[in-house]
């Protein structure tokens, strides 16, 4: 058996082609609740995070969102706190989703931080996190890339180096070239 049509989330990158006779680029499906929140203002998103997590975030501060995908990324949890602590405190705030079972090691890495910080293992409120962010540091899985594009966020993408066939690097390249 063969498929009559191959549906893909993104067009081929790096000059790649499909062996399928007919390929249709459909785009990456995004959760309906995220689609509904895509137009949220930063002020609304920050207020939502403050209500949900008693966070004390400020809508007028530049906000960095750090997350490593559904499992977190230990490298982000080690390096980001160190790099951010060297910056001028009071001029930005951080939202960091550390990943399951990585909260305590990440909390320790931020122990001397002088900037507002909301640190959680994960959250179902990604619309609020993305809406509040001015800059995102993350992996470049397909869902993440689609969500960043939907919310129109500036991002520093660090592909997971062991992803099958380098697909996260391809995803990042696709977004960078868009």
Language-model segments: which ranges?
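Short, structured coil segments at secondary-structure junctions
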Residues: 2-3, 18-21, 90, 113-115, ...
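Active-site-proximal region of nucleotide-activated glycan assembly enzymes
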Residues: 1-43, 49-54
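Short glycine/serine/threonine-rich phosphate/pyrophosphate-binding segments
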Residues: 1, 73-79, 140, 144-147
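Donor-nucleotide binding loops and adjacent catalytic segments primarily
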Residues: 39-136, 169-173, 177
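A donor-sugar binding/catalytic signature common to diverse glycosyltransferases
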Residues: 126-168
């Amino acid at each position: 058996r063969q498929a009559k049509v191959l549906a893909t989330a993104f067009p081929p990158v790096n000059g790649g082609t499909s062996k399928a006779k007919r390929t249709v680029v459909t785009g990456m499906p995004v959760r309906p609740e995220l689609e509904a929140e895509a137009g949220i203002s930063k002020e609304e998103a920050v207020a939502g995070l403050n209500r949900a997590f008693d966070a004390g975030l400020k809508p007028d501060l530049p906000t960095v969102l750090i997350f490593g995908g559904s499992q977190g990324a230990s490298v982000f949890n080690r390096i980001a706190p160190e790099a951010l602590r060297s910056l001028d405190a009071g001029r930005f705030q951080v939202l960091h989703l550390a990943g399951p079972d990585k909260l305590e090691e990440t909390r320790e890495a931020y122990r001397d931080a002088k900037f507002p910080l909301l640190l959680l293992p994960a959250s179902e409120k990604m619309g609020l996190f993305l809406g509040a962010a001015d800059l995102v540091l993350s992996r470049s899985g397909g869902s993440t890339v689609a969500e960043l594009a939907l919310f129109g966020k500036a991002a520093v993408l660090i592909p997971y180096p062991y992803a099958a066939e380098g697909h996260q690097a391809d995803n990042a390249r696709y977004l960078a070239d868009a």
